[in-house]
């Protein structure tokens, strides 16, 4: 038996966790929560442009395209459901990596990035209405985040 590390297992491990925790701490130190979230939404929007989704004609196809990119990122999965009565799209995102700052609690620090990512991806689709945004509306468990895509004026305060 050898004590050599299993390179396949090592390749599967996240290698950015310490960097992201230190970056989170630095951002938390120089920005208030609203500024930090705005910056992270912009990062998500930039990511959406870098990983643009093809135009699709069904919600199921959109969910598949989103999940393909999320899988490549190692950022979990999304389930999409249209709430016709409320005129919003519900996004249930599971298994987002939990990154917090060194000093802060661990949690969905990257959720603001998801807001920008989903806002931009959905806006890129054919027949997308202008001015709609994705915002966190609930957290069911540590690794389940619910976002709503709709008019900003209809959104309630989002949980941190």
Which role fits each region the language model picked out?
Residues 136-158:
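C-terminal edge-of-domain segments
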Residues 1-90, 95-109, 157-160:
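N-terminal accessory segment detector
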């Amino acid at each position: 038996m050898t004590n050599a590390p299993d390179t396949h297992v090592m390749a599967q491990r996240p290698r950015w966790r310490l960097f992201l925790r230190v970056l989170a701490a630095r951002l938390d130190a120089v920005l208030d929560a609203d500024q930090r979230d705005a910056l992270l939404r912009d990062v998500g929007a930039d990511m959406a442009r870098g990983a643009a989704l093809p135009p699709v004609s069904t919600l199921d196809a959109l969910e598949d395209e989103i999940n393909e990119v999320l899988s490549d990122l190692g950022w979990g999965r999304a389930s999409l459901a249209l709430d016709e009565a409320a005129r919003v799209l519900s996004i249930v995102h599971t298994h987002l990596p939990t990154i917090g700052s060194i000093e802060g609690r661990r949690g969905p620090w990257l959720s603001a990035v998801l807001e920008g990512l989903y806002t931009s991806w959905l806006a890129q689709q054919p027949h997308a209405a202008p001015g709609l945004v994705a915002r966190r509306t609930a957290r069911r468990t540590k690794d389940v985040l619910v976002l709503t895509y709709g008019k900003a004026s209809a959104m309630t305060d989002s949980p941190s």
